[in-house]
Design a protein with these regions (language model features):
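Interaction/scaffold regions that mediate signaling and macromolecular assembly across diverse proteins
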Residues: 22-99, 103-108, 115-267
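Positively charged n-region of N-terminal signal peptides that target proteins for export
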Residues: 1-6
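Sec-dependent N-terminal signal peptides
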Residues: 7-14
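C-terminal motif of bacterial Sec signal peptides marking the signal peptidase cleavage site
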Residues: 16-19
Length: 267
């Protein structure tokens, strides 16, 4: 009996270790990349960072291939693959560190997430959904310095640890139900204003059906609900009410919409 118990214990430990390695591989690891907590009074600034990253090439591509509704001309990106690859190589050649300001880190990680997502679609185009690709968020497709991160690693291992819920409305997963892809690059000099705009636009868009008593929200508020529990709140209502044109009652019924994973492509 003791031998069986010991074997059982070993199996449990082995399973736990294996699960942890899978968890890391599943896109939750930051691969040691630096993160900083965003202060409550975040301001946009380029003056307090050891590095100022040039995102102008990405800005030019976005203005050319993304419309104001956030729909993407992936055929156009495919034609401009060289310019896109040059920008990706620039980002990947950099190694963020603690001397970077929180503003530069936010802009860098948001842009690299969005740019590599576009590149992933272009690589597999034509497709109907990002979910048609094997492991889009779990494979190490994003080289940063000597490391290779997954898109999930950037989102879960870095951006979500920065104590900034608004990142959920800045990163784009190439799908209809995602917050729209801005047709401008995020920059340290405008980061706070850009995050505010992205958050307000998404909450007041048709991705959410907001009313005082019965509200149907994007699944983002279900999947990442704890990220929106700020100032001691235990639900998402208070956070949404900061931005919503319609105030939700504290005891309102909250439901969540099905997510549309169809490609956010210009028609």
């Amino acid at each position: 009996m003791k031998i069986l118990v010991k074997i059982f214990s070993i199996l449990i430990v082995s399973t736990f270790i294996y699960s942890c390695s899978l968890f890391s591989a599943a896109g939750l690891s930051s691969q040691g990349q630096p993160t900083k907590e965003v202060p409550a009074n975040l301001t946009s600034s380029t003056a307090i960072s050891a590095v100022n990253v040039d995102h102008s090439a990405w800005d030019k591509l976005l203005k050319k291939h993304v419309n104001k509704e956030g729909f993407v001309d992936y055929k156009g990106f495919k034609e401009d693959r060289l310019e896109l690859n040059n920008y990706l190589e620039l980002l990947s050649s950099l190694e963020p560190n603690d001397n970077w300001s929180v503003q530069e880190l936010l802009a860098y990680y948001i842009n690299i997430y969005n740019a590599y997502t576009v590149d992933l679609i272009v690589e597999n185009y034509p497709i109907k959904s990002i979910k048609d690709i094997n492991g889009p968020w779990t494979k190490g497709i994003v080289p940063i310095g000597k490391n290779k991160l997954s898109l999930g690693g950037i989102e879960n291992g870095i951006l979500r640890k920065m104590n900034e819920p608004r990142i959920h409305f800045a990163i784009n997963c190439a799908s209809i139900s995602c917050p729209r892809l801005f047709n401008e690059a995020y920059t340290a000099g405008k980061i706070n204003e850009q995050l505010e705009k992205a958050t307000s636009e998404f909450i007041n868009s048709d991705q959410n059906d907001v009313s005082p008593n019965n509200t149907k929200l994007s699944s983002i508020f279900d999947w990442y609900k704890k990220d929106f529990f700020v100032n001691g709140e235990t639900n998402v209502i208070a956070y949404i009410n900061k931005y919503s044109n319609t105030t939700i009652d504290a005891d309102a019924n909250i439901d969540y919409k099905d997510y549309n994973w169809n490609l956010n492509e210009q028609k």
